A protein has these predicted regions:
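Active-site recognition of the HExxH zinc-binding catalytic motif
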Residues: 58-70
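Metalloprotease/metallohydrolase-associated module, dominated by Zn2+-dependent proteases
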Residues: 1-55, 71-117
Length: 117
């Protein structure tokens, strides 16, 4: 795996963790294969190399939301996302919804950036 370079940073802060962003040169052939993965034990997000920009952004957001869910204990036993399939449905739904909101409202991310100073 090579480190992400270019427009993406090498790390993203999620809660108290600095999570490393890496690229994976694996090419996924099946429709059910993932484009990325969040590994809490390694503190990494891995993204498939060569994705289209929209897919790459959606994948990064998806994996960040997995990190948010894990770091905030939503995946612990007895919590709302304690089952892997439930977690995946919720994360995927929220990711796709937010991606659409950000894409349809180009002013929104700069607005948040200004307000979150």
């Amino acid at each position: 795996m090579e480190r992400v370079s270019g427009r993406l940073e090498k790390t993203v802060k999620i809660g108290y963790q600095d999570v490393t962003i890496e690229r994976d040169t694996t090419t996924f052939q099946k429709q059910t294969d993932a484009y990325g993965e969040y590994e809490h034990r390694k503190n990494t997000i891995t993204i498939q190399n060569g994705l289209q920009p929209l897919d790459e952004a959606n994948t990064l957001l998806h994996e960040i939301l997995h990190g948010v869910a894990y770091i905030n204990s939503l995946t612990q036993s007895g919590q709302p996302l304690d089952k892997e399939d439930r977690e995946e449905v919720v994360i995927n739904t929220m990711t796709n919804g937010l991606s659409q909101v950000f894409r349809d409202n180009q002013w929104l991310l700069p607005y948040f950036k200004d307000k979150f100073k």
